[in-house]
Amino acid sequence: FLKNISLEKGGEDPFVVLDPNNSYSANSGFYTRSQGYLRPNFSKISESLGVNGKNIYTLEGETNGISFKKKIEMDVVGYGIKIFDEITSTINDDITVTPYVLIERDNSPVKESGLMYTYLGPVFSSTRDTYEKYDFDDIKDAPYQNKTFGGWVAFIQHYFLTAWIPDQSAEHLYQARYNENRGKYSVGYTSKDSILSYGSKVVSSNVFYVGPKLPKQLANIEENLDLTVDY
């Protein structure tokens, strides 16, 4: 939920964006072709103070000889969150790992103040198209795929959005698909494969935005992200 924004004008209840009741969630990490998504089983969390007063939360876990660390760096003023995923191996065999990010939800309409329901859907930005809507019907008709340098992916609704923004100097494979059994749509991207060897580590960093459509803040985070704003 967003602490500084209320559901009703003058109300005390915070506005909820990511909501398990709508099956609306975001995640990042690694997967392998043999094991699928690697489950970190986080068992430890610590908090520290970073540069300019930023709150940093670090989660740590271990599964089958692989250590996981997720560092979450919260912006003091804005709604952008820097996320660093790191894995270290104590396994003798080399493992090919793929960094990924994901936003997943169903197509339930979003209830807003005044009982108004507004547009909800995915948007992609790439070198091919700086602002490409690919709605729920499009995804059902055909899964989305586009390989591009930089870019970003977002789920937008009236006034608010969630978005993942990767390393702009690297190439990423953007995707969207529908899981009929679960009734959920997922959008995201994968980054370049890495070889995880014994004693080595792989790090992936991304920016996650969850909050209102603030043009200046969005433009400062990444080029064309302010195109998500309704004028």
Positions of predicted regions on the chain:
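Soluble non-transmembrane domains of integral membrane proteins
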Residues: F1-D230
